[in-house]
Amino acid sequence: MTIDFDRSDNLQRPPMGQTRDPITHPLIVTATFVSRVDSTPRSERPQDAGSAKSKHGNEVHLPNWRPGALALEGNENLAFEHWDEYWRKVHGPKFAWDEPGSSSERVLRYDQVHRIASGPSSFFPPPYRAMIGDDGKLPAEPEKCVPPYGRPRWDGLAYITYAEQDDIERVLGQEKFAERIIADEQVAFRMVTREITREYILIPSARHRDPVSLVKIHMRNPDLSREEFQRRLLDEHAPLVIGQSATTEFVKRYAVLLNIGSTQKDPEGSKIDAVSILSFASLNDVEDYLVSSDHEAIAQSEAALTGEGSEWWTAINYSVMNRLMPEVATER
């Protein structure tokens, strides 16, 4: 049986999609952090105007009062699973497909980075220890000592790469993106950020198929200007990361994204000064990296540069579109 790949995103990445020679100058990335549509009160998670659409196309202003009205999924027990599936299997192919009159040719890469709660995070870092009571044994009544869940601000990242900044408008200004892709975002996401970043690939990926990423969102120490923070992150901190033996052992890709502006009003994304993304072969490799003595030195360096609002978490990677092979380190 021959599989029909019509309109599938397989056609937009290897081995089916065509690729071009790598680019060595810093690329431009719209590092779009997303939070999913769900019944969380707006007091706990902000919501973009017009998002969280109902089946009738209207914004559900108070989703915690009317979760059943959400177009994506009205059953709260299925809300996360349905959202995770929709983003990858429905929204991703819509973004990648060139409908008549549109072209995504200037999108060099589109990666979806889905946060996974079981992975390490700044809210619950490894090592993970067995819980014990005063008697040194496991709790006899575990129902009374369930740890609270620390929820990161974002549920994932749309990592969209362009050769130059003007290409963003050339792509997103098309009717397909400006109308129908935005409409689809309003079904799936309660908020998306709009920051533009300059990408520095410090450790290139061999195949750009590394399954797991550690995403570090940096908000600078208030004593530093954004310019000074970004300079020190790239010129001082990044060489420290690269120089650790644990990085050599575990890290398959390392990129730093420096915020240089936004495509539109961006109250949440504008707070982010930079993002570090380190990719790994497995979730256990992330855990082992974070508990290494080498990473302790990295964490101390980060702590001196960053401030309130910084967070990190682990995610699963999906390469939806990729036109660049092989990946190479950025020349500076």
Give residue spans per PLM region.
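Macromolecular interaction modules
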Residues: 2-332
